[in-house]
Amino acid sequence: MSAVPDDIAADFIIEAQEILDRLGEQLVSLEHAPEDSEQLNAVFRGFHTLKGGAGFLAINAMVELCHAAEDTLGQARAGQATLQARHFDAAQQSLDYLQSMLDAFGSGSEPPRAPQQLIAQFATSG
């Protein structure tokens, strides 16, 4: 873990946990109503915010996974892609990995990387 002041790390952990908790509910709602642009925007913002905080703290594993989700969601927001069942599956699995990464960061360990197969599931083609 990088030399980050304890209060900044603690604030990130609290905020990231709240975002992860919300994302779980928001993803279920979005999967049931994929045309709901408000819900799509909320899910995009959740991954975007996690990526930004993780980037600031150099949690590269978290940045990589959030970036993959954010790219796919961004394409869907722009009307350039349609979210498929595999995207929702990948997003739900990502929450588990992101939680593991957050737990590792909180305990001072190196966060585990997500499997490349999971990141590849976010691809909008194929």
PLM-predicted stretches and their roles:
Residues 1-126:
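Non-catalytic helical tethers at domain boundaries
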